[in-house]
Amino acid sequence: MDTDLNAIKKVNTRNNLIFIADVVLFFILLNTLPFTPEANKSLALLVFIAILWLTEALHVTVTALLVPILGILLGLVKSKEALAAFADPTIFLFFGGFALATALHIQNLDRLIANKIMAMSYGKLSVAAIYLFAVTAFLSMWMSNTATAAMMLPLAMGILSKLDPKRDHNTYVFVLLGIAYSASIGGMGTLVGSPPNGIVATQLGISFAEWMKYGLPIMLILMPLMIGVLYVVFRPKFDLQFEQSFEKIDLTPTRILTLIIFALTATGWIFSSKINPALSSLLGLQSKIASFDTIIALIATAVICITRIATWKQIQEGTEWGVLFLFGGGLTLSAILGNTGASKIMADGIVAFIEGGHYYIIGLIVATFIIFLTEFTSNTASAALLVPIFISIAEALNIQSLGLALIIGLGASCAFMLPVATPPNAIVFGTGMLKQTEMVKAGFWLNIICVFVIGTIGYLFWF
């Protein structure tokens, strides 16, 4: 107990010192930067928020709330404009995603899907491991990566319990890391799969279906590469048949209705570009429905409550409100930097160093930067901070802003080396069945592969 208290005191002392130093630096920059008064204020605010986000001296959500507060007090943005970002359509799209995930979880459909697919392995450990990874990735496309990893872990441990933890240690590590990494990679596949995706989509006006054109191929490429890396590094043994004993979950009318709502929602998101004009014409509207993906999400949320599939309280508890506030803070900061010219000042400064470099090399450098940065920082906070800056850099370099933004957004989900990097990493590390050095060994090579995959595809198709 005393050890825990001492550790908490040390963390609090560290965070307090960082916060005080950050405040001092804020006022120094405010009075010494050589640009226009508005740009000086914006850049000082950016540095202040960036330090808090990257060090997590304050909770990232609290820091996000400081953005509109300080922006208003510094005269950089009006109250209505600052708070409007917290009602951005993408925030409500993610809220609908949380509601849908809650419905699947409350009705035990996530477990039902997992059990049905695992039953197809017929007791073969190698097949079961691949199915575990595939189901984890699929569910992470629609649910929180954290919730998916937490749900799949007991299923994996039940299968691994037939093995000897010492003799078959490498097989344990292979399966556990595969679940964590599949959760992160799966989150790249859809717009609602991971918060950084939504940040990029909001900045560039990308729809759900458009995001899948970029994120899904990356996901499908990285999944087999991830499995290959884990196999080469750990050489697991699969010479075992295991008995299948999954909990019985009946397909009740309520669960069938939930699956129908899920299927209709996913279909609406994927084919929104065709459904929207047809529906608008049918309703006699003059133009297409704006933010159609978000409207679909809100309809799904309402139907889930109306049909009693999940209660409002359950949806409240299943929603990561901090993530939604972080979205709002990031969008407000982006607007402030753009309106005051601070983004252009930073972009011009960075461009001065990299101008003339080959676009492929620039893409690799950006991918390396974001992937290794998010080993130590929140991927959502990093994306909220960096996406608008790199959009400005792309514009200054006269290349597609889509390219660098996607590299940042997708690269932010590729933190595989450390337990603290992502919640799925922490969840499997918490089993005590693997060492940090083992995660670092596999994660480092997977990080490098992600750098080249994302950087190369970015150069060939996004720039």
Predicted regions and their residues:
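Hydrophobic transmembrane alpha-helices of multi-pass small-molecule transporters
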Residues: M1-L93, E210-D348, L446-N447, V451, ...
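Membrane-embedded alpha-helical segments and adjacent helix-loop junctions characteristic
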Residues: V62, L66-K166, Q316-L397
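C-terminal transmembrane helix pair
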Residues: K166, M212-P217, G329-L333, L337, ...
